[in-house]
């Protein structure tokens, strides 16, 4: 269990919260063609020469320090490619350099932008109603929670309420790759929340949208995207087809955990419309230009201008200035500028695409390695932050003074929170049980959030907390009777206060202490036997008490073996081996689910043994020991139950 507890990973970001139901979007304002603004004194002009030199000064060092094999970066401006560059290797062993126009990258969830574009095309064609029950378009039924139908708007804003899922998310064996239809029908995700109520990012929901595109268009999803988006935008080296077509396969970049390691296999994304695109930086330049030009690229038009502007028109915004989802596109403010886009991650590829519509600028970056200590995540974030600070700097941040009773409010909201993007069904729930956000009230009346490092927040208005010397904000509200924290930087998840029984500190303490007690019990068992043989005059327990003592010790060993089995199931997550979670693992998981009889029986035996120890009048040392062991056996059942290790669900 010590090893099992070490598996607990941070898996659910904090996020954002609705203040209303998603109805029809407000009309987007007309976009004035971008006009180059005069740079702030001391701010370099965004030119090809300056940007190219700046990238040359930053990216090679980032690759070397982070053990990242290669990266592509493309910046467009005013309808033209400003800079496109490749650094490092697409194939380290083969010394194949990164070619922005030919080398394909896996862009993960950035693929969703093509899915949402396809949906908007079919809205234009009158084939999809954003506010209709999606069951209208499906050949299987999703029973809505609380009777509130799921709409396409809900899917596009990640407010369908689906819980997260891991099973069949990725594969490496083409023989195991399911169609989107099969995946959706066999892996239907439960709803944690009624549709429209709470944001919870969902690959399942995005895959549903792609399947609806197939259903209403009459074309396979990959073919639809090729015919209606990629071809008009002259993107011949982009595809959703998996495995890659032979004509493109030779140009696919290798994917690495670290540049000094062997490459991993090609990652097959089972929720294809949610993340299976392979593309080049050169092709993505065309996509960015089209979005910045209201759907137009050259002589092609993939969306009407008024429809394209919906990607900059949030359906729901919980608070002015907060990030929001606009028909599948992230909308946020960076340095006071509107930024529209989407990031994307597979296990080894890490991508981001950001558009500044008001400046006519697009920024695309894709790394082919996770890097040492997940360096690609930080490198990706820092690169765009530095780009914005260099070319579009923010005015000095001024944090308003705190309101009078901020310190009292800080104490009231301090505690543990779980993300709305989580799993409650199946054994993966254990991760979300143990890893939670902690909000701490500081002595100066500010609060700190464990997942937002090195930042403090000051209450500047009732229930509104702002980063000290920064723009980030937190809004305190309530949904479904639970205190909820909305992060201005995250529109796809919220933090929800946990009840005492789900408190991660409590459960870690119960689990950790229980394991230590059971380990001691198991290890001391042979010691006790040796003492009996060595000192035969010692008092010996006999009869039923002896049998119960034996069974209690056996239960301790059985519980440790049971937890060891679950560790073997959960350990691949530590190595990012998500592809192992498929039907091939069902037999082992079912065996462990049946084996839950071991800790359940052990808890009963432990209590029985403690009761017998007291009833037979044994000494206080034996009594205390029996109670501690019984509590430990009960503790294992507690954590197993709270972490959904006890149950028979194979959909996780």
Placement of each model-derived feature along the sequence:
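Sec-dependent signal peptide recognition
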Residues: 1-6
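Short, conserved catalytic-motif segment at the N-terminal edge
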Residues: 44-105, 127-132, 136-137, 143, ...
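Compositionally biased, proline/threonine/alanine/serine-rich low-complexity intrinsically disordered stretches
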Residues: 7-47
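Short, surface-exposed loop or secondary-structure junction motifs
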Residues: 84-92, 144-357, 378, 383
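Peripheral terminal and inter-domain segments
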Residues: 377-652
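Short, well-ordered beta-strand elements
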Residues: 342, 352-369, 483-488
């Amino acid at each position: 269990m010590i090893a099992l507890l070490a598996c607990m990973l941070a898996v659910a970001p904090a996020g954002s919260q609705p203040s209303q139901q998603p109805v029809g979007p407000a009309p987007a304002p007309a976009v004035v063609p971008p006009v180059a603004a005069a740079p702030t004194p001391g701010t370099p002009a965004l030119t090809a020469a300056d940007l190219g030199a700046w990238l040359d000064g930053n990216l090679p060092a980032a690759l070397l320090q982070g053990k990242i094999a290669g990266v592509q970066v493309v910046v467009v401006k005013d309808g033209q490619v400003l800079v496109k560059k490749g650094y490092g290797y697409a194939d380290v062993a083969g010394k194949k350099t990164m070619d922005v126009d030919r080398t394909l990258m896996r862009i993960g969830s950035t693929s969703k932008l093509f899915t949402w574009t396809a949906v908007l095309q079919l809205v234009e064609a009158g084939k999809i109603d954003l506010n209709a029950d999606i069951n209208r378009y499906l050949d299987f039924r999703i029973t809505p929670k609380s009777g509130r139908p799921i709409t396409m708007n809900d899917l596009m804003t990640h407010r369908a309420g689906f819980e997260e899922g891991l099973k069949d998310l990725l594969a490496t064996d083409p023989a195991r790759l399911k169609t989107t239809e099969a995946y959706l029908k066999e892996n239907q995700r439960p709803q944690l929340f009624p549709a429209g109520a709470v944001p919870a990012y969902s690959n399942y929901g995005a895959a549903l949208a792609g399947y609806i595109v197939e259903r209403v268009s009459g074309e396979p999803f990959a073919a639809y995207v090729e015919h209606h988006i990629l071809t008009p935008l002259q993107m011949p080296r982009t595809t959703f087809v998996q495995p890659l077509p032979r004509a493109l396969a030779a140009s696919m970049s290798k994917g690495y955990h670290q540049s000094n390691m062997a490459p991993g296999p090609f990652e097959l994304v089972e929720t294809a419309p949610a993340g299976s695109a392979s593309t080049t930086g050169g092709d993505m330049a065309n996509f960015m230009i089209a979005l910045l030009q209201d759907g137009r690229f050259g002589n092609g038009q993939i969306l009407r201008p008024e429809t394209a502007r919906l990607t900059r028109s949030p359906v729901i915004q919980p608070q002015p200035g907060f990030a929001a989802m606009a028909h599948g596109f992230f909308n946020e403010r960076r340095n006071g500028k509107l930024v529209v886009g989407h990031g994307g991650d597979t296990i080894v590829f890490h991508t981001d695409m950001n558009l500044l519509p008001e400046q006519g600028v697009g920024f695309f970056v894709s790394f082919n390695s996770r890097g040492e200590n997940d360096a690609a995540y930080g490198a990706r974030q820092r690169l765009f932050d530095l780009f914005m600070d260099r070319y579009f700097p923010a005015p000095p941040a001024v944090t308003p003074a705190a309101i009078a009773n901020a310190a009292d409010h800080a104490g009231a909201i301090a505690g543990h929170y779980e993300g709305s993007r989580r799993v409650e069904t199946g054994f993966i729930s254990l991760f979300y049980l143990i890893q939670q956000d902690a909000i701490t009230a500081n002595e100066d009346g500010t609060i700190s959030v464990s997942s937002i490092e090195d930042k403090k927040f000051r209450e500047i208005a009732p229930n509104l907390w702002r980063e000290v010397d920064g723009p980030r904000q937190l809004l305190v509200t309530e949904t479904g009777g639970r205190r909820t924290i909305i992060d201005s930087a995250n529109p796809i998840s919220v933090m929800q206060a946990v009840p005492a029984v789900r408190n991660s500190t409590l459960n870690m303490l119960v689990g950790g202490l229980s394991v230590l007690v059971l380990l001691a019990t198991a290890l001391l068992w042979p010691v006790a036997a040796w003492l009996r043989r060595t000192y035969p005059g010692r008092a010996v327990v006999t009869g039923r008490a002896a049998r119960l003592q034996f069974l209690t010790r056996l239960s301790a060993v059985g519980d440790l073996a049971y937890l060891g089995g679950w560790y073997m199931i959960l350990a691949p997550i530590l190595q990012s081996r998500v592809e192992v979670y498929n039907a091939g693992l069902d037999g082992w998981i079912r065996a462990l689910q049946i084996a839950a009889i071991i800790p359940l029986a052990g808890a009963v035996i432990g209590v029985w043994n403690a009761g017998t120890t007291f009833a037979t009048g044994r000494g206080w040392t034996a009594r205390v020991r029996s109670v501690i062991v019984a509590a430990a056996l009960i503790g294992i059942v507690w954590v197993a139950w709270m972490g959904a290790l006890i149950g028979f669900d194979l959909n996780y």
